[in-house]
Each structure stands twice: as structure tokens, then as C-alpha cells.
């Protein structure tokens, strides 16, 4: 008797628990998202849009892909996603186990209940920070650039780009953004805009466009699921090119942020981009060893301009000519004509090679021309910066004073100065071509106070 009552009571409790769970609406954030992450996002994220479908956000999920909207609120029977995941032989996911019957039913009920997005406000953008960071030690400087008038110096920080007076005497603005890592910065030719690229490795890649005078963000574009590198402005300032860890080259409209093209001919990370003097061609440099010349109007590959010798880590175009300099992972420094490389394949010729410079003792991470193109500065894992004459390739001077690798160089537009940043977290400024150090400072507000060392 007692045993029968116990069984009856247990059964009733189980039924009540089940009914209670079914009465509770399906949560997009707590129920749907975990299944999407496990079974779907591997093929449907910004860096890999199978079927043009992105399932990483509610808005993108709702938008759907090439077959139309993924779901229709309140009507699971008319929703494409249910057709794809349900049945004895579902077409999705392509790889991995099919969703369980309970998971399919959960999707159906979520859609029937209106397919609402209940993502908490503080989780909608996991990269956003409310306040500028406080540094406890100098951060690695991955990129820096002088403004065209020479008045400002943009320096990479954590989640921000710092704008200093060019001599380092004053921090004038902190441009806070979503990207934890800032990989490249570039001013437009007129100095009115600043483009910033970066992201969160393996999670998000972004390009930001800033109004330099107002110190305000005009637009931020999350383009991929991995970091964006090598941002550059067209001569007219109406387009931006950038590379990415997703092996792509993108061309973006400055006016509206529209992606004008996505070039997928590289087979490894793309670290650098630049435009030809007339703006009609884009050149990209990649870890796949190739520098590719691309038609800027239609994204067609024109040619690989170089012989494939080593990973291309950094590139810089001559300020007045269609000549490109690159630094490689094996210490190579070479300059090439930015033109078709016809006839290279028969005898493995390097027909566009202009000059091969002194080999560096370690990988080259940064390279730049002086404003008149007469000097070429090179930096990397070796903690000094040799400066070469482009006329004959001889060394004109050497910049010293670093205690670690150097990741970025920028020439002052109106003075014979070179700024460099890297692992030691300081900006070093040198006189060209001799390499005499004239100034160094830590640009990061450590405990709310910028620390200068000289």
C-alpha cells in the first residue's frame, strides 16, 4: 500500500516538473544559442558563411541566407530552419550528429512562441567596455602612425587607440572601441579620418573609422571571426583596404561601410594592403609568401608580383612610385615593381625585383619609406632599426635603444624623424638618417597618469 502511494506520488511530481518546464518559454540565450554554438556556428559565422548564413547573432539568424529568412515568428512549419534540422535524414548539420528530437522540438516551440531574443543587454556585445582601461604596466605597441600634418601620433592600446601630440608631450584623446587588440592604424590623406583595424583573435575582426577632429567614432564594422590587419586608405580617401587572419582582402566604402569586394585568393593570413598611386589597384602581402596585385574595381587577380621566397610579414609602398617594399619572416628585405609578373614561371624568374637589401638577423615586422622615398627603415625581432638609402641599398644609419622586438614604424611627414614602437611599450623617436634617438615615452596612462621616460 505504502509502496503504491510512493510510486503514485513520484509519478505525479515528475509530471508536474515536466509541465512546469513546458510552461516556461524557451530561452534563445539559454536554450537555443548553446545548440547553435555546438552544432551550427562552425559553418555559419562571419568568417565562413555557408549558404550566406550567419548564426552567431539573433539578427543574423533572423535575416537568413541565400534561401531566405531562417524562421518565421510564430510559424515553425513555414520556417526554413525546421525543414533543415528535422526528419529522419536532416540536411543540417552537414557535419556531426543530427539534433535530437528534443532539440528540434525546442526550436519549434521557440519559433511558435515568437522566436524572441532574450539575450541580456550586457551580453549583446561581449567585447564592449564602458570605461577606458587602466594600465598597470606598458602595453606592447603593435602599430602607430603620424597624421599627415605631423601634429598627431596615433598609437595602439588595449581596446583603444591613443592620440598624442606628435612629440609625446600630451595625450589628447583616447579612442575607445570594441577590439581588444589593435593591429593597424592609418590616417586618410587629408588627415580627417583615422582607420583602425583589429579584433579579438579567433572571435572577431573589426575596422573602425574615426573623425579625427571630433574624436568620435563614425562607424565600426565587424567583418569576420578573426583579427583584421593592414588597413590602408585609397588616395581619394573614399575606400579602405584591409587584410585578415581569414586569408581575405576586403575593400570597404568609407561613406557607408559597404563591403565593395572580398578577395579570397590567398591561402594564409594577409598582414598588409596598400593602393597603387592612382588608386586603381590594391596590393596585398600574405603569410603564404605572395604579394598579389588586385584590380580595385572588380576584385580580379592581376598577378602575383614576386617570387615566393618567405612569409610576407609587412609591406610599404614608395610615397611617389608604384614600388613596394616587403619584410619577411626569414629576414629578407626586397623591393618590387607593382606590375604584372609575366614570364616568371618558365625559369622561376623574379622579374619585378628592384633591389634586395641586406638580410636581417631575424624576422622583419615593420618597414617604411621616408616621405621623399630616399630612405627605407626596417625593424623586427632584432632590437635595432637599420636605415638604408634606396638609391643604392647602402646603410645610412642605425636606430638603437630598444630592449625587445619592434613591431611598427612611422615616418614624420615634414621632419626627418622616425617613430617606432614594440615590445618594450615605449615610443622611440629618432633623427633620420643617422638614427640618433631624440625622445622616448610610455604612452599608456598607468594609474591614470601618462609616464614619460625622457
Regions found by a protein language model. Give the residues of each.
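Aromatic- and Gly/Pro-enriched helix-to-coil junctions and flexible linker segments
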Residues: 19-152, 157-158
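Secreted/luminal cysteine- and crosslink-motif detector
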Residues: 14, 41-44, 315
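A subset of signal/propeptide-processing and intrinsically disordered low-complexity segments
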Residues: 17-18, 26, 283, 419
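WD40-repeat beta-propeller superdomains and closely related acidic/aromatic-rich repeat-like regions
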Residues: 118-454
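Bacterial N-terminal signal peptides that target proteins for export
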Residues: 1-10
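Hydrophobic h-region of N-terminal signal peptides that target proteins for export
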Residues: 10-20
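Secretory pathway export signals and precursors
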Residues: 9, 36-39, 238
Amino acid at each position: 500500500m505504502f509502496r503504491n502511494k510512493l510510486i503514485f506520488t513520484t509519478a505525479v511530481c515528475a509530471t508536474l516538473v515536466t509541465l512546469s518546464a513546458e510552461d516556461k518559454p524557451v530561452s534563445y540565450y539559454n536554450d537555443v544559442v548553446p545548440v547553435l554554438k555546438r552544432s551550427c556556428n562552425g559553418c555559419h559565422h562571419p568568417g565562413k558563411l555557408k549558404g550566406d548564413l550567419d548564426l552567431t547573432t539573433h539578427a543574423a539568424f533572423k535575416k537568413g541566407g541565400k534561401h531566405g529568412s531562417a524562421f518565421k515568428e510564430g510559424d515553425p512549419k513555414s520556417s526554413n530552419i525546421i525543414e533543415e534540422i528535422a526528419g529522419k535524414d536532416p540536411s543540417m548539420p552537414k557535419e556531426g550528429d543530427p539534433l535530437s528530437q528534443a532539440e528540434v522540438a525546442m526550436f519549434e516551440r521557440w519559433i511558435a512562441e515568437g522566436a524572441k531574443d532574450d539575450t541580456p543587454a550586457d551580453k549583446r556585445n561581449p567585447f564592449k567596455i564602458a570605461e577606458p582601461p587602466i594600465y598597470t604596466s606598458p602595453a606592447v605597441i603593435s602599430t602607430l602612425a603620424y597624421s599627415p600634418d605631423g601634429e598627431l601620433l596615433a598609437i595602439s592600446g588595449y581596446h583603444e587607440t591613443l592620440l598624442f601630440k606628435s612629440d609625446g608631450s600630451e595625450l589628447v584623446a583616447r579612442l575607445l572601441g570594441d577590439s581588444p587588440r589593435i593591429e593597424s592604424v592609418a590616417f586618410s590623406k587629408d588627415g580627417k579620418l583615422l582607420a583602425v583595424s583589429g579584433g579579438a583573435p579567433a572571435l572577431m575582426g573589426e575596422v573602425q573609422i574615426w573623425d579625427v577632429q571630433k574624436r568620435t567614432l563614425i562607424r565600426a564594422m565587424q567583418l569576420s571571426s578573426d583579427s583584421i590587419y593592414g588597413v590602408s586608405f585609397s588616395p581619394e580617401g573614399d575606400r579602405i583596404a584591409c587584410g585578415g587572419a581569414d586569408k581575405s582582402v576586403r575593400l570597404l566604402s568609407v561613406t557607408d561601410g559597404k563591403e565593395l569586394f572580398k578577395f579570397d585568393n590567398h591561402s594564409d593570413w594577409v598582414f598588409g594592403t596598400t593602393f597603387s598611386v592612382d588608386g586603381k589597384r590594391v596590393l596585398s602581402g600574405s603569410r603564404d609568401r605572395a604579394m598579389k596585385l588586385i584590380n580595385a574595381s572588380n576584385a580580379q587577380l592581376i598577378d602575383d608580383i614576386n617570387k615566393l621566397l618567405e612569409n610576407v610579414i609587412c609591406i610599404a609602398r614608395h610615397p611617389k612610385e608604384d614600388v613596394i617594399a616587403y619584410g619577411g619572416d626569414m629576414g629578407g628585405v626586397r623591393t618590387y615593381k607593382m606590375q604584372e609578373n609575366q614570364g616568371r614561371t618558365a625559369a622561376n624568374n623574379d622579374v619585378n625585383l628592384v633591389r634586395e637589401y641586406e638580410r636581417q638577423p631575424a624576422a622583419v615586422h615593420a618597414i617604411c619609406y621616408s616621405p621623399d622615398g630616399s630612405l627605407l627603415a626596417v625593424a623586427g625581432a632584432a632590437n635595432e632599426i637599420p636605415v638604408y638609402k634606396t638609391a643604392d641599398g647602402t646603410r645610412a644609419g642605425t636606430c638603437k635603444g630598444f630592449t625587445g622586438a619592434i613591431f611598427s614604424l612611422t615616418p614624420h611627414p615634414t621632419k626627418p624623424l622616425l617613430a617606432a614602437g614594440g615590445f618594450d611599450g615605449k615610443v622611440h623617436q629618432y633623427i633620420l638618417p643617422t638614427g640618433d634617438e631624440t625622445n622616448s615615452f610610455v604612452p599608456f596612462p598607468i594609474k591614470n597618469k601618462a609616464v614619460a621616460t625622457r
